[in-house]
Each structure stands twice: as C-alpha cells, then as structure tokens.
C-alpha cells in the first residue's frame, strides 16, 4: 500500500567488510578457477556477486503474470467474471502447438480457475479475445518494460525485452499471456503485483524510509510516491478473490496459514534454450486477503532437476516469510478463513 520494501535476500552472499577478498569468490567459483583469473576476469566476477539480482536481473516470469492478463480483460469489459473455458491441453496458434502445463487438459474451468489451476490454455483464449493492442497496453500500464525508479543502483533495462503491439505475432501473444517470451525483473513484478491487490495503486518502490543525522535525529522521512492507477478497485477485488482460491484449492495450497487468509500465484517458466529442460519456479503471495499488508515474491532459478516444475518449495518459503512478517508487524489475525 505504500511501496516500502522491508527486505531483500538472495543466495549469493559476500563479506560486506571485505568485499574484494578473494574468499568471497569461492562461493561461486572453485579455488583453481579463481587462481586462473586475470585481474579483468576477477573484476567481472566480483561485479557478478555484488549485483542485486532482484533489481538487476531480468527473466521470464512465467505464470505469476497470468493475473495481469485477466486484469486487462476485466478492466476493459472483455471479461465479466462468469466465463468458462475448455482446456484440452493445448492451443493451435498458426503452425504452432502450444501446450498447457497440464498436458491431458483441465477440462471445463471457470475464469477464477484459470488462475487458481494455472491453465495456459484458458489464458491463451483470454489473450486472443483481448487482442495484441489491449494486451500490450496493459503491460505498459503495469509498468513492465519501464524502470520502477527504486532507490538502488543497477536497475535492469527491460524496454527491449517486451513485444510491441505492432511486432507481436499471434504466438507471441499466446505465450506472453502466461508469462513467457518476454522478460521482467523481480522488482518490476513485485511492484506491479502490489497494484493488482491493493485497489490498483502503483507505488514507486523504496528501501529507505527515513534519513537521520549522525546523532540520530530525523532529517527527513521518505513519503510514498503514487505513480499511477493501473486498474479499478472492483477489478482488484476480483483478482484477490481469484488468488485466494489459488491458496485455498489450487496450485498454492502450501501457503495456507492458520491465522491469516492468503492469496497468490505460482509460476513456472522454462529457460532458454528450451531444450535444456531447466526452469525458474516462483510464487508471489500476499496476506491477509481482505486487507493485504505484506507481499512476498520468491524465485528459485534452476531448482534441482527432480523437482524442476514443482513450485511447492517457492510456496513454502513464501509462507514462512509471510508468517514471520505478519507477526513482526503485529498485523491483526484474519476473522474469516
């Protein structure tokens, strides 16, 4: 509701007191690899481990993007909320056969189930009905392709990593509907997702809340910056309901909590080259559903091969962070589950 970022973390760490110590490189490289590095190569290696991937890296978001596709349809009146779709496991798009993750098909499903069950087939049908102009306009409306303006250096440039409407093919539209064939950063997704669930308010993300002098006196407070309205409150309310269904009975059931209602969207994106069979799995979760106070976004890059398409670990991590955060912030428990 204000763009504040409480915490960021990633698996690559280094000693902040001695950032140029070669020992820091051993968390990513072997000793023999470090010994063979030239000074130029070592500088490049240090820059890689110092980089904040949440802000600086871009990747295909996968199914965490699906609520945005649905949001565009609801906001434009193309969708009413009572639609049903038949998933037979794939869509033929020109010469291409594009599969749903559920290869045998979900059968007849509702609009809310297109999100809660994460159905690619239904999302392709929705995007086709919207058309490429509406789809591309809402991508930009949610600020994908633009920098968020976060108060940290090295934010990724992603303007060239989205399809323009004029260049978007039918296959591009189909795959973009479920978060593939374009890239974004975690901070872009997190900021946009907040506007999906908070009534449509897109805030500039920031990590600094307050500036203080050397003796501890407050010099200035960083006030929230409302950038734009992305969708209506009515559309936002519907999406929260759909994403609660994801946790209650869909792909995100491992995020269920004892004391709070929760919602969210799981994501699986196959990395390029597709033939390598490697995936990014993720979960964007929030709580409580009736008045979201915390959003947690977890991304696991190239999870162990035996669980490549299993988003469960990302969901479990997000649940733990949500529970701890809600307790730390003294958020009132949900009255209704």
What does each model-found stretch correspond to?
Residues 1-64, 68-300, 310, 331, ...:
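Beta-lactam-recognizing serine transpeptidase/beta-lactamase-like catalytic domain environment
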Residues 302-304:
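Short beta-strand-to-loop transition segments that serve as allosteric relay/switch motifs
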């Amino acid at each position: 509701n204000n763009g504040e970022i409480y915490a960021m973390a990633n698996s690559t760490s280094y000693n902040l007191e001695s950032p140029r110590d070669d020992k820091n490189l051993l968390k990513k490289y072997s000793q023999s690899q470090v010994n063979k590095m030239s000074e130029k190569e070592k500088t490049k290696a240090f820059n890689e481990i110092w980089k904040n991937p949440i802000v600086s890296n871009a990747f295909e978001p996968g199914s965490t993007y699906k609520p945005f596709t649905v949001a565009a349809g609801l906001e434009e009146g193309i969708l009413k909320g009572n639609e049903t779709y038949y998933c037979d496991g794939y869509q033929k798009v020109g010469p291409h056969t594009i599969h749903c993750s559920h290869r045998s098909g979900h059968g007849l499903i509702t609009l809310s189930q297109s999100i809660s069950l994460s159905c690619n087939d239904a999302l392709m049908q929705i995007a086709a009905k919207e058309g490429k102009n509406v789809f591309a306009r809402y991508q930009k409306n949610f600020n994908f392709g633009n920098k968020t303006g976060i108060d940290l250096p090295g934010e990724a440039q992603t303007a060239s990593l989205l399809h323009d409407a004029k260049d978007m093919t039918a296959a591009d539209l189909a795959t973009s509907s479920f978060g593939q064939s374009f890239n974004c950063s975690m901070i872009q997704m997190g900021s946009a997702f907040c506007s999906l669930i908070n009534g449509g308010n897109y805030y500039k993300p920031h990590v600094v809340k307050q500036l203080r002098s050397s003796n501890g006196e407050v010099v200035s407070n960083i006030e929230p910056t409302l950038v734009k309205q992305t969708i209506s409150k009515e559309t936002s309310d519907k999406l929260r309901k759909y994403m609660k269904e994801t946790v209650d009975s869909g792909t995100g059931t491992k995020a269920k909590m004892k004391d709070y209602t929760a919602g969210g969207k799981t994501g699986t994106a196959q990395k390029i080259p597709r033939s390598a069979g490697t995936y990014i799995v993720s979960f964007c979760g929030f709580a409580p559903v009736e008045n979201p106070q915390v959003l947690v976004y977890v991304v696991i890059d190239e999870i162990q091969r035996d669980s490549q398409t299993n988003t469960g670990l990302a969901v479990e991590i997000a649940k733990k962070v949500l529970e701890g955060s809600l307790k730390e912030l003294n958020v009132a428990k949900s009255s209704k589950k």
